[in-house]
Amino acid sequence: MKDNVIPAFRRGYRMQWEAAQDSHVVLYPEGMAKLNETAVAILELVDGKQDVAAIVATLDARFPDAGGVGDDVKEFLQSAIEQKWIQCREPE
């Protein structure tokens, strides 16, 4: 995954707090997926404006003791693409 691509939720997909699940979830037309704290930290930055490098930089600053989260963030985003939650576009 290139650092300059910009991830965004696909149409019909969104992340929200679901009180019944007592957690954040990704809602999509066929159902929902319960998210862990790491997934929430990443997906809350997926806004269709920030590129992958900016998301990684924000999380590196937020979690300095993690020793660099870039590979993990990219791996998660790739998984979210495969799950069809998000899509990435090239910068304009």
Swiss-Prot record:
> Is the keyword Methyltransferase in the record?
no
An example GO biological process term is:
pyrroloquinoline quinone biosynthetic process
Pfam families, alphabetically?
Answer: PqqD (PF05402)
**Which terms does the record give in the GO molecular function aspect?**
quinone binding
Query: Could you tell me the keywords of this UniProt record?
Result: PQQ biosynthesis
Specify the pathway: Cofactor biosynthesis; pyrroloquinoline quinone biosynthesis
Q: Does the keyword Transferase apply?
A: no
> Its quaternary structure?
Monomer. Interacts with PqqE.
Query: In which family does this protein belong, per the annotation?
Result: Belongs to the PqqD family.
Q: What does this protein do?
A: Functions as a PqqA binding protein and presents PqqA to PqqE, in the pyrroloquinoline quinone (PQQ) biosynthetic pathway.
Query: What's the protein name?
Result: PqqA binding protein
